[in-house]
């Protein structure tokens, strides 16, 4: 029996989300000029707005990853994408420096959990021989999302304005969750599209990793 290829759909989901998160992340760089004009922000205040994301991302990346370990990727990642998409939309509702800073800070807190949870998802769904390649492609798609963000954001802002533009960009995350949540399972064994051969491939790889880890620990104990 040949293995099924359900795991490749997991990779596609990871690649799509990596691209979406970078589009939503970088879009503010294209909107910052009209934002600064409408909210009467000077250069220092604009810097505070742009820096809010980086601060929260650094603070929450590890906790959000641990949350995925404890509660499972399916639920945690779905909630995180909805949370950061909500704050993407709420970017368009900000009315002053404080509100914009809070919104961007909370947006960063949501996005901070993306790559830790995607990494866990790929480790559960891919054999060891495919993980490094999938991780590399996922990071590349993220950067392509960053490259696509300027023209996409410019198009959206030009046609809808920056406020409605962020609402439109938020819909990308909502659409992703609408497909991911009903389809994905934390354990490949629980997925109806995974046959016995594909499951055996994944289980064998998992046992190999556990064996190698045990050998390393015994070596350290000597």
Language-model region placement:
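Juxtamembrane intracellular "pre-TM" segments in multi-pass secondary transporters
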Residues: 1-3, 187-222
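Residue-level signature of mid-helix packing/kink "hotspots" within the transmembrane helices
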Residues: 26, 54-62, 112, 146-147
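Helix-breaking motifs and short loop linkers at transmembrane-helix boundaries and internal kinks
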Residues: 40, 72, 93-99, 110, ...
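Extracytoplasmic
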Residues: 9-43, 64
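Cytoplasmic helix-loop-helix junction between adjacent transmembrane helices
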Residues: 103-142
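Conserved MFS/SLC helix-loop-helix module at the cytosolic interface between two early adjacent transmembrane helices
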Residues: 59-98
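Helix-loop-helix hairpin linking two adjacent transmembrane segments in secondary transporters
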Residues: 138, 142-184, 188-191
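Small-residue-rich transmembrane alpha-helices and their cytosolic helix-loop interfaces
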Residues: 18, 50, 54, 81, ...
């Amino acid at each position: 029996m040949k293995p099924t290829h359900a795991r490749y759909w997991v990779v596609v989901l990871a690649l799509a989300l990596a691209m979406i998160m970078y589009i939503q992340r970088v879009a503010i760089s294209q909107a910052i000029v009209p934002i600064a004009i409408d909210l009467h922000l000077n250069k220092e205040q604009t810097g505070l707005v742009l820096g809010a994301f980086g601060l929260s991302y650094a603070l929450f990346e590890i906790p959000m990853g641990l949350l995925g370990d404890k509660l499972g990727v399916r639920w945690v990642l779905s909630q995180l994408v909805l949370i950061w998409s909500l704050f993407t939309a709420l970017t368009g509702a900000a009315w002053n420096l404080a509100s914009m800073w809070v919104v961007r800070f909370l947006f960063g807190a949501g996005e901070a959990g993306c790559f830790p949870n995607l990494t866990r998802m790929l480790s559960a769904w891919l054999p060891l021989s495919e993980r490094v390649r999938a991780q590399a492609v996922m990071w590349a798609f993220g950067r392509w999302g960053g490259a696509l963000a300027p023209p996409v954001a410019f198009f959206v802002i030009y046609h809808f304005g920056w406020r409605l533009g962020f609402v439109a960009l938020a819909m990308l995350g909502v659409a992703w969750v609408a497909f991911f949540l009903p389809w994905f399972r934390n354990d490949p064994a629980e997925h109806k599209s995974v046959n016995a051969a594909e499951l055996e491939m994944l289980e064998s790889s998992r046992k190999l990793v556990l064996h190698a880890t045990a050998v390393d620990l015994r070596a350290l104990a000597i």
